């Protein structure tokens, strides 16, 4: 062993005192799987593991159903009158349901087999739903769909599951102008399509982005698209790469392995456009193929491609009128360039209220007051607030509070402030959230109360 004396410059401490307000409600910080209705007037999305619908842009969110299961991945029928979605329950497993938005409380379970369902999508006629069904065991143990997941379909009226093909890493099934072929996406093979019997796979397009930092001395390959979805009306596709959303033109080339790199969209091999400034999630097409919707946090973004193209042409025309070169893009031009329209989606649920008086006594307390350690200390908690920390025999409790006081003797134990892990790998299931997540409990057991 050896020691080295070294001076290292540090930047300013990033510390913010955020107020924590006791309110009756909790505001959701994220909307998931947002889907806009075919006519563009309504939004269905997942928040707090329940599906909500609202009128755009400023309607009040309402629960779609009164089910007690976890809900997710809503998708509109072609008519816009029904929404299909998946459910999950720790005991009963998952299913696919549909709900009518024109007939109140009309909810129907479509699947007979319990399992792990995801990525439901209607065909263009509206008489079938295609989806992925995965292993219950893989989902329980790893939170993933697993290698044995299957692509299947079911009648929109309900019934038996019908096998199409193994997913083989493919996901995000979708349809375009007709329902003759099912389009799929995978990180390794990009966008492809198959027939309803799983045959005649046609590889259409691969999209890659920047090369992220890897290992010193070893160059990382370009990042593949997380998923690619073809436009329902046009020869375009959206691609999500490293949480940024792009739209690329699909040229008719006759090539079997068509690929494009969008790390610099101005130099891409065929037209491409970056839609996001700070990133985006859960990207999807509008029914007309003119709009791409995505979310970030609790905001929904609507990117209108024809308007964006028109704005670009106007900026170029202004440059030519002013005898400027096309390459001379200044801050003023960037400020004038098209930006996706943003709507903040505010979803609230009632907060569980914690009431009572608890004394944790006779513990060794490592405080946040410098290096102070209280060997025989106590923590007094009222409702959901720590009101006093000090030596056990110095904690003052009013006589009127003694009857409601709950005391916990922690002799031989140590109380520490909760740890913040800013690079936690909690391994949660990404698409279907569980009510009970063992990785959260394991982190909490080791004192981690905040993760990022």
Spans of features found by a protein language model:
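Non-catalytic propeptide/linker segments at domain boundaries
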Residues: 310-354
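Histidine-rich, glycine-flanked metal-binding segment
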Residues: 371-416
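A short helix->beta-strand "capping" segment at the edge of beta-propeller domains
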Residues: 10-31, 267-276
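Signature of short aromatic-glycine-proline-rich micro-motifs recurring in repeat-based ectodomains
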Residues: 21-35, 217-228, 278-283
């Amino acid at each position: 062993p050896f020691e080295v004396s070294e001076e290292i410059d540090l930047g300013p401490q990033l510390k913010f005192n955020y107020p924590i307000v006791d309110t009756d409600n909790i505001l959701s910080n994220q909307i998931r799987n947002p889907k806009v209705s075919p006519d563009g007037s309504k939004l269905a999305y997942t928040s707090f593991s329940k599906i909500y619908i609202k009128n755009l842009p400023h309607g009040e969110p309402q629960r779609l159903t009164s089910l007690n299961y976890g809900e997710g991945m809503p998708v509109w029928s072609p008519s816009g009158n029904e929404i299909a979605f998946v459910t999950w329950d720790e005991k009963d497993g998952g299913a696919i349901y549909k709900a009518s938005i024109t007939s109140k409380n009309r909810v129907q379970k479509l699947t007979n087999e319990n399992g792990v369902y995801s990525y439901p999508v209607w065909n263009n006629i509206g008489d079938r739903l295609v989806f992925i069904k995965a292993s219950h065991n893989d989902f329980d143990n790893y939170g993933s769909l697993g290698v044995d997941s299957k692509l299947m379909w079911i009648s929109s009226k309900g019934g038996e599951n019908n096998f199409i093909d193994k997913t083989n890493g493919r996901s995000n099934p979708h349809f375009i102008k007709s329902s003759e072929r099912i389009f799929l996406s995978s990180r390794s093979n990009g966008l492809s399509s198959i027939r309803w019997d799983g045959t005649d796979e046609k590889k259409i397009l691969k999209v890659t982005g920047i090369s992220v930092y890897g290992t010193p001395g070893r160059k990382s390959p370009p990042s593949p698209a997380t998923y690619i979805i073809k436009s329902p009306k046009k020869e375009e596709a959206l691609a999500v790469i490293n949480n940024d959303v792009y739209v690329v033109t699909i040229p008719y080339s006759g090539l079997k392995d068509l690929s494009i790199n969008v790390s610099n969209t101005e130099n891409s091999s065929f037209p491409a456009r970056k839609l996001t400034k700070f990133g985006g999630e859960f990207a999807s097409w509008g029914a007309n193929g003119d709009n791409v919707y995505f979310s970030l946090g609790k905001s929904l973004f609507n990117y209108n491609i024809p308007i964006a193209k028109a704005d670009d042409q106007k900026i170029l025309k202004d440059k030519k009128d002013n005898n400027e070169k096309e390459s001379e893009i200044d801050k003023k031009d960037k400020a004038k360039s098209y930006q996706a329209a943003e709507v903040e989606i505010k979803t609230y649920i009632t907060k569980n209220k914690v009431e009572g008086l608890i004394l944790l006594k006779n513990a060794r307390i490592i405080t946040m007051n410098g290096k102070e350690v209280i060997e025989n200390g106590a923590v007094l908690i009222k409702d959901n607030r720590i009101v006093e920390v000090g030596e056990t025999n110095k904690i003052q409790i009013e006589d009127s509070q003694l009857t409601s006081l709950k005391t916990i003797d922690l002799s031989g134990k140590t109380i520490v402030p909760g740890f913040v892990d800013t690079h936690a790998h909690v391994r949660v299931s990404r698409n279907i959230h569980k009510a009970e997540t063992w990785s959260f409990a394991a982190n909490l057991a080791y004192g981690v109360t905040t993760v990022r």
